[in-house]
Amino acid sequence: MSLEVVARHFDALGSTCELQVVAGSQAALERCEQQVRLAEARFTRFVRDSELSQLNASHGRYTPVSPQMFSMLEAAVWAYQESGGLVNAAVLPALMAAGYDRPFIEGLSQPASVVAVQPAPLVEVLALDRPTRSAAVAPGVALDLGGIAKGFLADQLIDELGDNAVCNLGGDLRLRGGGPEGDGWHIGLCDRSAVALTDGGVATSGVTRRRWGQGMHHLIDPRTGLPARTDLLEVSVVTDCALRGEVYAKCAVLLGAVGGAAFLEARGVHYAMLPAEASRAA
C-alpha cells in the first residue's frame, strides 16, 4: 500500500523547486520553502544589499558573515579543490562579460563583443577566518555562488524534511527513505533512465536551461573564461549528496564526453550523459 506524499512546488533560485515528504505536513514544507527564500536573498548577486553583494564590494577587507554564508564559502573552496579548479566561484566577471548581468527571467541579450575573462584561482582570492567567522574577497574579484547553491541547500534542508523525503532544488536533489512504496524514491536522469534510491543525492548540470544570444549560456569554462564548448548537453550524477553531484556533473560537462566519463568513472559514481547529437536526432 502506498503511503501519502505531501508535496510543495515553488519557484526560487532561478528554478522550479519541489519538496516531497511521506506522511508529512504542509506546515513543514512551508518552513523549508521559507528557508530556501531566505538563503536565496542572502546568496543572490542581483540585489545590491544582499550578503553576497556586500562581500563582493568589501574591497579585500575581512567582513563578518553569517554562519550559513561561511559554510557556503567553505563549500565553494571545497568545490574548487575537488574539481581541480573547474568549479570556480570567482567566475562572476566572466558571467557578466558573457551578458549574464541580470536575472535570467528578465531576458538577456548578446553582448556587442564577447570578451574572455578567466577567473582568478579561488583559493588565491578568497580568504576565510574561522575564529572570527569572516571572509575577504580580493579587490577586483567577485563571487557567484549559483554554481553550488542548489546542491548546498538541498543537503542542508533534507534534515528538516525528515527520514522519508526529497528536496529537489532545480534538478539538484537530496533524498532519504523508502519513498511512498518503500522501494526507494524513483529519480529520472537526463538520458530518460531512472534510479531508485533510499539515500543520497542526484544532480544534473548542462548547457540547455539558460541560453541567450548566439551560443551564450551560463556554464563558464574557467580555462577559457567563456561559455563552455562541449559535446554534452547534460550530465546527471548519482552520489552521496547533492553538492558533490552538482560539482561532479559540472566537471563532466566541461570536460566533454570522453574526459567527463573518465572523471566520473575514476570517482566510482553512477552517471548519465545526454550528448549534443541527441538534440539534432530528436
Name the predicted role of every residue range.
Residues 1-282:
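Mature catalytic core of soluble alpha/beta enzymes
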